Swiss-Prot record:
HAMAP family: ZipA
Record-stated family: Belongs to the ZipA family.
Residue ranges crossing the lipid bilayer per the database entry: 5-25
Organism: Xanthomonas campestris pv. campestris (strain ATCC 33913 / DSM 3586 / NCPPB 528 / LMG 568 / P 25)
Region described as Disordered: spans on this chain: 30-91
Name of the molecule in the record: Cell division protein ZipA
SMART domains: ZipA_C
Keywords: Cell cycle, Cell division, Cell inner membrane, Cell membrane, Membrane, Transmembrane, Transmembrane helix
Periplasmic side: 1-4
Quaternary data: Interacts with FtsZ via their C-terminal domains.
Function: Essential cell division protein that stabilizes the FtsZ protofilaments by cross-linking them and that serves as a cytoplasmic membrane anchor for the Z ring. Also required for the recruitment to the septal ring of downstream cell division proteins.
Designated gene of the protein: zipA
Pfam families in the cross-refs: ZipA_C (PF04354)
Cited InterPro entries: Cell_div_ZipA (IPR011919), ZipA_FtsZ-bd_C (IPR007449), ZipA_FtsZ-bd_C_sf (IPR036765)
Length: 244
């Protein structure tokens, strides 16, 4: 199997990791009997996250993922969150209706080294925090939650700083969860240059949510989508009392 094929297989897991991550942002812990993951997944949303059946393990080899495996991944992230106790980048609530994602993938025959990813993240203004992943925060208002976040595509998606020198990943995922602490278009305009700069620093390539090279046409399409999203979610105009 070619290196690019392995990267594409690896990125498939990111969609599930993103959904699991969103459920964990600001999510109160529940007993296993109280979980309603299947019911939540059936609720209509503007964006349908990909349903996947395979991914890659820490060695870059394919592994099968079942519904039970997805729940286990969620539990692993939950445990890490409790152990770390870092709420930097935690969403104030779990409500969301759209996710916009991009990827930075290593070039053929290469990998992204954990240590290099951390250095690049710090250079681009990302902060390590909630769920042991990186976040871009609103300057001066971290309590508003992340503008966007960055995770590894390898399960469980987090960065183990104690073993960061040994970490390798074929790609990293950036995800913008809406509503964000600013307009969707403004949030995108902060995420896109960060992703592009990360790709430069890591000598990687930027991929869209379909795992294709991100081009101008796709960027323009995403901007149009987010403008429409902002129009739909803007506050209704205040009615003015008539002048007499």
């Amino acid at each position: 199997m070619s290196d690019m094929a392995m990267i594409r297989i690896g990125i498939l897991i990111a969609g599930l990791l993103l959904v699991a991550a969103i459920f964990l942002f600001g999510r109160p812990k529940k007993s296993p009997q109280g979980r309603r993951v299947d019911k939540d997944d059936t609720q209509p949303r503007e964006r349908r996250e990909p349903v996947i059946s395979s991914g890659v393990d820490a060695d870059g080899m394919p592994f099968e993922r079942s519904d039970t495996g997805a729940e286990q991944s969620e539990l692993e992230l939950d445990d890490q969150d409790g152990a770390g106790g870092n709420d930097v980048g935690k969403r104030p609530n779990q409500d969301f209706d759209k996710i916009v994602s991009l990827f930075v993938a290593a070039k053929a025959g290469q990998v992204l080294r954990g240590e290099d990813v951390v250095v690049a993240a710090e250079k681009t203004g990302l902060v390590f925090g909630h769920m042991n992943v990186f976040h871009r925060l609103v300057e001066g208002h971290p309590e508003r939650g992340p503008i966007f976040s960055m995770a590894s595509i390898l399960k469980p998606g987090s960065f183990d700083m104690a073993n960061i020198r040994e970490m390798q990943t074929p790609a990293i995922a950036f995800f913008l969860t809406l509503p964000a602490p600013m307009t969707a278009l403004d949030a995108w305009e902060k995420m896109l240059p960060t992703v592009q700069r990360m790709a430069e620093l890591l000598d990687g390539v930027v991929l869209d949510d379909s795992r294709n090279a991100l081009g101008r046409q796709r960027v323009a399409h995403i901007r149009d989508e987010l403008r429409a999203y902002d129009r739909q979610h803007q506050a209704p105009p205040l009615t003015k009392s008539p002048r007499w």
